[in-house]
Amino acid sequence: MRSNHLFFRKVMTRLEVHPLNNSRLFCISDSSSTSLYSEPSKGSTIFAQQALDRFDWDLSIGETAFENMTDDAKMRNDPGMLVGPDGMLITPELLIASPGKIDVFDCASLDDTAGALEGMSLASGEGSNCMQAMRPRSETRSTNTTTSRSVAKQILRNTYGPVRYKDYANYLGSPENREVLREFIALLQPLPVSLLFSLRKLSKSIYFIAEAGAIDAMLEEMSIQWVERHKPLHYQDNYKLVHIVLFSLLILNSDLYNDMAQMKFTSAQFVDNTVYALLRESPTIDKQSFEAELRVYYDLLAMDQLPLHKPPITASHSRDSANPTKKSSVFYSRGHRMERTYSNSSTYSMSTISLQRTTTAIAAKQTAAVASWRFHNFSDLPLIYCKEPFDDEMNNTNDSSWLMDHIIQFQEPLGSVSRAAAASMVSPTAQPRRKLFNWLKKGQPDSIFKSHHEFGSAEGKWYNARVRISEGRLYIFNFKNQPALDPKTADLELCRRRAASYTVQNLFGAMATFVQDNIVYKSNSQTTWNFAITFPKTIDCETERTYQFQTSNMTMAQRFVQAATFWSARITPLPSAQFEMVSNQEYGWGEKLLSRQVAATDVRLTDWMPLIGIDSIYDEIEDSGDLTVDSQLQNLRVFTEHLTQLLDQHNSYKPKMVEIWTQNPSTQQFEMAMENWNRRYLYLNSMYEKHYTYLRALETAFETVTG
């Protein structure tokens, strides 16, 4: 027993009590000073503190201060009796008679003196929150609870023999071990008010390299127990909001301390995009409270990364680390919410929920990463097109412009790295970068976060995949070398659980292309046909990403291209603003110059650049859902005609420019003028080709439903 004082905290409304010889049991009221016996109050909590605790409690901002117990408040020598802070005896009869005054009292095993409390669960009849509704408690505790608690303790001590310590997180995250996970998180109590401190506590308590499903399950359980304990108003008693913040912090940590990522997320980017995800979950949140809290989290995390759990050096651990051939789990998605299902190597990185902010509404709102995150977390994916009467039937017609769903070959996305150094984007007080776990080393096979630049090259390996194009989105379930699940027998939920990895991409601004030349598949000399889908760099990624696919027949490849192009054309808004710089600067074809009102020797040329990128000029994504297919068709016809006129006009400049600039003695000026002309021509032509392709695909699809 601690001599004069026993530290305690007012903690969550659920606690398993362990009758150890060195533990003491107290009842603490809301004010931490009033006896529950004399003044029972809603929110009172039963709290057990072990004298020989192996962890020091984390201090965090806003955490309830530690209080000193008086000698009178200590446990009496009678084992199992509960005593209030002023020494009043709390009997089982009192607890039974006042269930409405106690949120939850969950006692798995007390000794004989308090045997009447064995297995009792008392929950408040008032103000029950979403966790209580979601996770109802049975009247009697299962005998498995004691076993689960024992296993959880062994995992916390790194002594659970049946599983390697590096696989503890995977073990806890599996659905069949959910009760063990609950007990494990309960052993980390009290969880700090600060979610970052709570995440640190978890990170240093277990080897946190695991499949995404396992990590997600652990964060979910921590979120549930955190909300049961803490009641900040801006979290609305909603564990999903906590889950989003925890997940965002974890991914931010990987971004800040990933040596391969030169451009780090700024505080504003992290805050804005996390708040956006929170608003998607609950539109009524207090934005200012979350923004202030997230800014503090960013600053703290920028100074010190999440700790890596290092278990005691033992012979068994040494053997584990010396055997790199053993299966190392990867961050895979788990069936739970928008991007949390059971897949095995989810391709979402920092952009999954804390999205890269760019000037485009696409990147800021409905990016491909948001689609993946929502799909992973079982959130309903928003409708991103204007639904019409013919859509109900066509959305269920495979091998059509509306739906393509087949097993084909898939190669992980290609993308070049063009990240600029971004030291200025990181807090100047940040300490030197340290590697984040083993996750983020280049080429590390068990990396849980895949960066875009790690994707395969044109000579990369092909994998079995189920690929689906439907309602404006591309779904890829990568089964690696295992047989992919047939769409006829497996739904999307089963694919999420079985796939090695998966991704969901919105087709905003995407471009699908068919490879005309057939390819001989090297392994079996089988003729195959390729197609690719490229996403603009402003959508979820700083560089263009190209997904490559391979089919066994030409027709299927062409149909995939048509479906992808149709949906891109249908949902991608057309540029509605000026997309070229309007200024008095001269690029080599100014009206006064071409009419010879100004001599070439008297002008100073400037490099021509588009005002913004081709795919950064769309209106808000939500607006695209207001247009019918027919309206989008008309707009595309008008826009492509406008681009045709611009191209014709630009081509007419060329002869005059050559005549004028060849007379200029400056070769450098001539080359600069020609380069400007060529750059603008390529820009306009690329816009024309893309939108003309959209127009043809939309016309082809529309004809099938209008005759």
UniProtKB/Swiss-Prot annotation:
Protein name: Guanine-nucleotide exchange factor YEL1
Coiled coil: none
Bilayer topology annotation: Peripheral membrane protein
Main location: cytoplasm
Residue ranges of domain SEC7 in the record: 110-304
Record function comment: Guanine nucleotide exchange factor for ARF3 required for localization of ARF3 to the bud neck and tip and involved in actin patch polarization.
GO molecular function: guanyl-nucleotide exchange factor activity
Domain of life: Eukaryota
Keywords: Cell membrane, Cytoplasm, Guanine-nucleotide releasing factor, Membrane
Gene3D superfamilies, sorted: Arf Nucleotide-binding Site Opener,domain 2
SMART domains, A to Z: Sec7 (SM00222)
Localization, UniProt: Cytoplasm; Cell membrane; Bud neck; Bud tip
Annotated PH domain residues: 447-571
Ranges for region Disordered: 127-148
A GO BP annotation: regulation of ARF protein signal transduction
Designated gene of the protein: YEL1
InterPro entries reported for this sequence: PH_GEF_YEL1, Sec7_C_sf, Sec7_dom, Sec7_dom_sf
UniProt entry tagged with the keyword Transcription regulation: no
